[in-house]
Amino acid sequence: MSNLDILEARLRAVEDQLAIYQLVCGYGYAVDGCNTQAVGSLYAPDGVYAVADFATMEGRERIAGITNEEGHRTLVGRGCGHMSTLPYVVIDGDRAVATCHTMVVEHRAEGFGVARLSASRLQLSRKPEGGWQIDHRQNFMLDGGAAGPALLARLQQGPAPLTP
């Protein structure tokens, strides 16, 4: 491998990492802005968003549709922010996993407070048309149960094997 090939591979790795960071943090801005199109663009057409104590949403349209739900609109109307910490990313070719904390901060009479704190694991893939999208996102509340810490403990595990 030539020095130029090595440099190109390193640059691509950095670009992939930055693109995944943008994707992970972009969800909060899009969902708080009730931007259905932007939320949808983050997910593969058959993407899944599984929130352990809430619901499993399947398909880009269903996931993006959360921005139009009454409960979400009420939360946004009171003042809230969906935030992600900087993810730990493992890239394996055209597939990747990002592990992070996510939280919902909401406005309350006494000021702002964390309403939800979750462990999140996102499985992503590079799409043929370019860019990365979320194939599967799993959240577990960090409420003292075992599932959240167990998910975070897997941070160095790469993407799950593809199933036929």
Q: Can you say where each PLM-predicted feature lies in the sequence?
A:
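Short beta-strand edge/turn micro-motifs at domain boundaries
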Residues: 97-99, 117-153
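Short, low-complexity N-terminal intrinsically disordered segments enriched in polar/charged residues
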Residues: 1-29, 33, 41
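C-terminal-biased regions
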Residues: 6, 80-86, 105, 141, ...
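Short, cysteine-centered beta-strand-loop-beta hairpins and adjacent loop/turn segments enriched
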Residues: 105-114
